[in-house]
């Protein structure tokens, strides 16, 4: 979606918590609906990655990814990991997710895959460490806030050796703040019901 950086476009964010705009790839204009497929996992900056991370970072252009990581201080990817406050980053992800949601007028479905859940994401250029949480299942929803909240709640119910390590990381990095900020923007709710499809 962002093969031509000169064609990036900006989405304004209403009532921002941290960032006032989101920068996305030009080809995003070609779509008025989408399915967001996410592999739930830990993340070294955001605590965890799920639907909201995919909706924010995943849809951002290269400049937009830096913009979110730096909480509106820079569009330069080389500066993207230098000293951003953890609450600023997780708030920026919640802000950015709202811009894409409202651009699509809610025409988005979300799938979170909870298999091979690792504490870390391989987006940092290294292989994720060994999985220490058993496979939980797959969730689908039209609510990005509810699906991420439900995913984390299901991880909390596991008793595997890696569960506490991941949950401590999410807490330390203020990961659930992304869910809170997205809910504040009105793109979903943390209230949910789980229904089996089989």
What does each model-identified segment do?
Residues 1-198:
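Extended, low-polarity segments enriched in aliphatic/aromatic residues
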